[in-house]
Amino acid sequence: MPAQPLRDILEPGWAKALEPMADRIAAMGDFLRAEIAAGRSYLPAGQHVLRAFQQPFDDVRVLIVGQDPYPTPGMAIGYSFAVAPEVRRLPGSLENIFQELCADLSVPRPTNGDLTPWTRQGVLLLNRVLTTAPRQPGAHRGKGWEEVTEQAIRALAARGTPLVAILWGADARSLRPFLSPAPTIESAHPSPRSADRGFFGSRPFSRANNHLLEQGAQPVDWHLP
């Protein structure tokens, strides 16, 4: 992750929203460069660490919170739950998200795990922690990313424009106090370990669209190629 001013690496709205975290983001960059210097790599690739903050801040209308990047090399691309289109064997969580998407909206199963079409419609796919070590889930928890993403979420809620938050799992649900007055949709995490405990059947996509309509906003076209 390059050592640059926020205005040079983030979308202008995000650069302003995250200005209170400029020192923390710089410190996280120092941490990642120290990891590389010590012979330890991290995921996702440096140019994708802050990818979620490169889409327009003012356009965000749905927030989907993940935990941290996929620890399998070649999968994490800077968006929660998404993988590159060439990844053929999808993570279990994403398979379950697609299963619920098809059941909720009666749409065909997506052909790959690229969720970029959602981001183009104002869906922010944000991990609570933005990096991890290869094959070590949660390796960078408590290092400082939580402060950054908390500020991002507070800034979104403070805009006073339509917003719906989809919170899957206990980690994501802990962010509810920072999201008021935005409506939240909460359930178990889509992980294969927990999806049967309330994720399946929760209909998050249709419910999110209903909340958007109630706020006078256009619904999201959740269909994926």
Swiss-Prot record:
Active site: 68
Keywords tagged on the record: Cytoplasm, DNA damage, DNA repair, Hydrolase
Main subcellular location: cytoplasm
SMART domains: UDG, UreE_C
Catalysed reactions, as listed in the record: Hydrolyzes single-stranded DNA or mismatched double-stranded DNA and polynucleotides, releasing free uracil
Cross-referenced Pfam families: UDG (PF03167)
Any one GO biological process: base-excision repair, AP site formation via deaminated base removal
Molecular function terms, GO-annotated: uracil DNA N-glycosylase activity
InterPro entries linked to this entry: UDG_fam1, Ura-DNA_Glyclase_AS, Uracil-DNA_glycosylase-like, Uracil-DNA_glycosylase-like_sf
UniProt-listed Enzyme Commission number(s): 3.2.2.27
DNA repair recorded as keyword: yes
Subcellular location: Cytoplasm
GO CC annotations on file: cytoplasm
Role according to the record: Excises uracil residues from the DNA which can arise as a result of misincorporation of dUMP residues by DNA polymerase or due to deamination of cytosine.
Family: Belongs to the uracil-DNA glycosylase (UDG) superfamily. UNG family.
Designated name of the protein: Uracil-DNA glycosylase
Natural source organism: Parafrankia sp. (strain EAN1pec)
Name of encoding gene: ung
